[in-house]
Amino acid sequence: MNVLSCSINTLIKEGLYEISGVEVGQHFYWQIGGFQVHAQVLITSWVVIAILLGSSVLAIRNPQTIPTDGQNFFEFVLEFIRDVSKTQIGEEYGPWVPFIGTLFLFIFVSNWSGALLPWKIIQLPQGELAAPTNDINTTVALALLTSVAYFYAGLSKKGLGYFSKYIQPTPILLPINILEDFTKPLSLSFRLFGNILADELVVVVLVSLVPLVVPIPVMFLGLFTSGIQALIFATLAAAYIGESMEGHH
C-alpha cells in the first residue's frame, strides 16, 4: 500500500494527471480584431451554403414549362416544406416557409455532409473539419434563431398581450411557463448535436475496427437518421411558431 501511495503521489507531483490541462478536442481559430472566430464551423458552413446555392441555381436557372428532373426535385422539396409549415403553423404559414425551409435544408445538407464529404483529408493547423451540426455552436445558434422567430411571431400577432400566456391558465404556472421558453432551445440544440456527434463517432470507431463491410450499413442508417433529425428540428420550429401565434400549449 505504501509503495502504491508513493507511486500515485509521484505521478501527481510530476503532473502526469493535470486534469485542468486536458482538452476534449481541438479547435482552429481565426483572430479578427479582438475576437476569436471558430474557423472550422465557418469553413464547413460556407461549403454547405455553397452547395445549396449552387444546386439551386443549376436546377432553376432555365425554368421549363415541362419541368426538368432538377426542377421537379426542388418543386417537390418546396411542396414538402410548405406542407410541414402549414400543418404546424396553420393558415398563416406563408411568410414562414422560407425560414422553415432554410432551417431544414441547411441542417439536412450539414448532417449528410458529415457522412458523404471527406472532411478529414483537409489538414488544419489544429483540429479537423466535420459537419457543421457536429459542433454545439452551430446547433445552439440555430436553436436561438428559432427562439427569436417564435417570439417575433407571437409579438407581431398579439403585441404585448403575447406575454399574458405566461400566467395562463393560472399565475401559479408563471415560473414553469418561463422555464419552458428556456428549455425549448436547449432541447433543440442538444438533441441535434448529440445525435450527429454520436453518429459520426460510431462510424469512426467501426471503421477503425472493421474497415470494410460493417461500417457501410451503419453509414446508411446514419444518413437516414440525419434526415430525420433535420425534419424533427424544422417541424418543432414550425410548431413553436404556430403555438406562439395561437397562444395554446
UniProtKB/Swiss-Prot annotation:
Its main location: plastid. It is found in: Plastid, Chloroplast thylakoid membrane. GO terms for molecular function: proton-transporting ATP synthase activity, rotational mechanism. It comes from the Eukaryota. It is a multi-pass membrane protein. Gene3D superfamilies: ATP synthase, F0 complex, subunit A. The chain crosses the membrane at residues 40-60, 97-117, 136-156, 201-221, 222-242. GO terms for cellular component: chloroplast thylakoid membrane; plasma membrane; proton-transporting ATP synthase complex. SUPFAM superfamilies: F1F0 ATP synthase subunit A. Pfam families: ATP-synt_A. CDD domains: ATP-synt_Fo_a_6. Keywords: ATP synthesis, CF(0), Chloroplast, Hydrogen ion transport, Ion transport, Membrane, Plastid, Thylakoid, Transmembrane, Transmembrane helix, Transport. F-type ATPases have 2 components, CF(1) - the catalytic core - and CF(0) - the membrane proton channel. CF(1) has five subunits: alpha(3), beta(3), gamma(1), delta(1), epsilon(1). CF(0) has four main subunits: a, b, b' and c. This is ATP synthase subunit a, chloroplastic. It comes from Olimarabidopsis pumila (Dwarf rocket).
